Design a protein with these regions (language model features):
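A residue-level marker of the well-folded mature domains of exported/periplasmic proteins
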Residues: 2-5, 14, 18, 22-333
């Protein structure tokens, strides 16, 4: 059986039980369809039909990780028998395009919006506009980092960075050495929080030294080149620590240059490539965050808010550490 964070699974089972109790007693069956639209995908299922419709506006759909969030949102829509449209900008982290999508969702009369709030200030006005129109908004995967009153479904970002740093600095690097942080979007509030967590862990190790932060972009090929250049500039660096799904590029660089065991790597998310790098000792750690649930639970929360009047809640989707000791038991996502 593939491992998952047990507490999260328990929460999911409880949630499914709750909604099963509210569903029709008619036998399962009928047609289940997923229709592709210009804005993204539209999911509808066989549960009792509802006029409610929700928009899930992601910041990107250019990796298997984001596809898992999309799948989670669509499966929630199918389970509830409601319309869920998943969409994202044509280029990753395009703030103007994402804001425009949200504004279109507001004017189109969606009953609720879930979105990735990755910029500390950029979403405040459009969220207020939605709320003024009576449309609830919940954030997923990333949050602004400010006390903006928007509930969040995702990982404890700063703490997950701390966990990564603590493991790498203590158990892998033996309390000494130099490290570089690799980020696909240095301005993202979530990635900044993880960086802060890593640096908090570093304070516990006086002989650990931060060297630099490099922008690896959201293209894996480009990312490998950026990491290589950083290594050439700092050949005495001992570890590259990623803070996002493109951490996979760290392992690619290490393995391609036969630096396994000499330079260490760590990062986030459970892509197939990253898990292979863990198995081959090109990376020593990656941390999962359950992207399926990050798509699933916002839709469920919006539904219970609109249907039954429950408040939206913060939900922690967990941090699952994967090392060489358990990588063989982990399923890519």
């Amino acid at each position: 059986m593939k491992k998952r964070v047990v507490s999260i699974l328990v929460c999911m089972v409880m949630a499914l039980g709750l909604f099963a109790g509210c569903s029709s007693s008619e036998p399962a069956g009928g047609n289940e369809t997923t229709e592709t639209t210009a804005a993204g995908t539209q999911a509808q299922g066989t549960a009792p039909a509802s006029d409610l419709k929700y928009a899930v506006v992601l910041h990107a759909l250019n990796s298997s990780f984001y596809a898992k969030m999309q799948q989670g949102a669509e499966e929630a829509g199918k389970a509830l028998g409601i319309k869920v449209d998943v969409m994202a900008p044509t280029t990753a982290n395009n703030l103007a395009e994402q804001i425009s999508m949200i504004e279109t969702c507001i004017s189109s009369g969606y009953d609720g919006i879930a979105t990735v709030v990755w910029d500390p200030d950029g979403f405040a006005d459009v969220i207020k506009k939605a709320n003024d129109a009576g449309i609830p908004v919940i954030s997923l995967n990333q949050k602004s980092g400010k006390d903006d009153g928007v509930m969040f479904v995702g990982q404890d970002l700063e703490e997950s960075g701390y966990m990564l740093g603590k493991y790498m600095f203590g158990q892998v690097m033996g309390g000494k050495g130099k490290y570089i942080i690799a980020s696909c979007a240095p301005a993202d509030s979530a990635l900044i929080a993880r960086e802060q967590g890593i640096k908090r862990a570093a304070k516990e190790f006086p002989e650990i030294e931060f060297v630099d932060l490099v922008d690896i972009t959201t293209d894996l090929t480009t990312a490998v080149g950026v990491i290589e250049n950083a290594y050439l500039a700092h050949p005495d660096v001992n570890a590259f620590l990623g803070v996002d799904v493109f951490s996979e590029s760290i392992g690619t660089f290490i393995e391609s240059n036969k630096l396994n065991g000499k330079v260490y790597g760590a990062g986030f998310d459970l892509t197939e490539g990253t898990l292979k790098h863990i198995s081959n000792n090109a990376m020593q750690l990656t941390i999962g965050q359950n992207p399926f649930l990050q798509g699933y639970y916002p839709v469920m929360q919006l539904f219970t808010h609109d249907k039954f009047g429950y408040d939206l809640l913060n939900m922690n989707t967990g941090a699952f550490l994967v090392t060489k000791d358990n990588v063989s038991e982990v399923k890519p996502e």
